């Protein structure tokens, strides 16, 4: 058990220019999720490009933005959707987890968006949240919708490297959100936002088994969101309402907190 938790302070790197903030554009997402509020953007899904640029999504306004290493912001796509998560696929294309439209593919050169998965066995998704590609190209994504402790029916899906054979790995999640695999591709970690937990899912060719609790995250107005692993196997857990990133070692002990 780690006895001392290191506290770090994050520094602001870049801020969205005022010219890109949408004050008066109608948004059904804002109406549904933040009624009466003035929301000029809601950024999610950060993913690093090979050239060092950072890509993010703007959920309420269906925008995909690129932030160059020098801090320059560019709108790369603007479409009818609620993009929530985004990752690079091994072939160099970007894939988006979209709450309204499912899993999409984005050509980063042209901004063209095409559907990959719009549902499962003639049933629509609840509302896709985030996605992850393992090193071999296997796709994992969460279908969060409005699930929570009152309705623990959120799903985690898997598709092969050729994006075929979509399967449900888990359908009992209380708001599955961010997810990440270990380098070996033998374990999947999933943030369960409403229960403030990180679940560990052993991975097998036939699915998963003995899914367990890896770590409990401090509760609050929200819960754990995006996840990342470093080369030492430490897990980084973003927590929006706490304004912090919690860091856990491979045994599930908290070793650090990054305040934002």
Where in the sequence are the language-model features?
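Blade/loop signatures of beta-propeller domains
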Residues: 1-28, 150-153
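Beta-strand-rich domains and repeat architectures in extracellular enzymes and scaffolds
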Residues: 14-63
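A short beta-strand motif characteristic of beta-propeller blades
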Residues: 29-36, 71-77, 114-121, 164-170, ...
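Beta-rich, blade/repeat-based domains predominating
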Residues: 34-51, 79-102, 121-139, 146-147, ...
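Short, solvent-exposed loop/turn segments at conserved positions within beta-propeller repeat blades
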Residues: 59-60, 99, 147-154, 193-196, ...
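A short loop-to-beta-strand structural motif that recurs across blades of beta-propeller domains
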Residues: 63-65, 102-104, 154-157, 197-199, ...
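Short loop/turn segments that connect beta-strands within beta-propeller blades
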Residues: 67-72, 107-111, 160-164, 202-207, ...
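Loop/turn-rich, solvent-exposed surfaces of beta-rich toroidal or solenoidal domains
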Residues: 197, 208-211, 215-253
């Amino acid at each position: 058990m780690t006895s001392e938790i290191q506290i770090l302070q994050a520094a602001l790197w870049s801020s969205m220019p005022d010219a890109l903030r949408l004050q008066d554009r109608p948004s059904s997402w804002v109406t549904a999720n933040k009624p009466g509020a003035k929301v000029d953007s809601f950024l999610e899904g950060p993913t690093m490009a090979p050239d060092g640029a950072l890509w993010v999504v703007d959920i309420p306004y269906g925008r995909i933005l690129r932030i160059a290493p020098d801090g320059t912001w560019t709108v790369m796509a603007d479409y009818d959707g609620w993009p929530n998560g985004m990752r690079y696929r091994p072939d160099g294309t970007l894939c988006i987890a979209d709450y309204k439209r499912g899993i999409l593919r984005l050509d980063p050169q042209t901004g063209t968006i095409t559907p990959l998965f719009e549902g499962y066995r003639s049933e629509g998704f609840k509302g896709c949240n985030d996605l992850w590609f393992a090193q071999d190209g296997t796709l994992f994504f969460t279908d969060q919708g409005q699930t929570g402790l009152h309705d623990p029916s959120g799903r985690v899906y898997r598709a092969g490297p050729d994006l075929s054979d979509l399967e449900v790995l888990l359908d009992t999640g209380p708001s599955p959100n961010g997810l990440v695999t270990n380098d070996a591709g033998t374990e999947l970690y999933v943030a369960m936002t409403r229960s403030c937990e990180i679940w560990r899912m052993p991975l097998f060719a036939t699915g998963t088994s003995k899914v367990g609790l890896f770590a409990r995250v401090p509760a609050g107005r929200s819960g754990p969101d995006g996840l990342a692993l470093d080369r030492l196997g430490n897990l980084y857990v973003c927590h929006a309402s706490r304004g912090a990133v919690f860091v856990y070692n491979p045994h599930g002990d908290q070793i650090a907190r990054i305040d934002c």
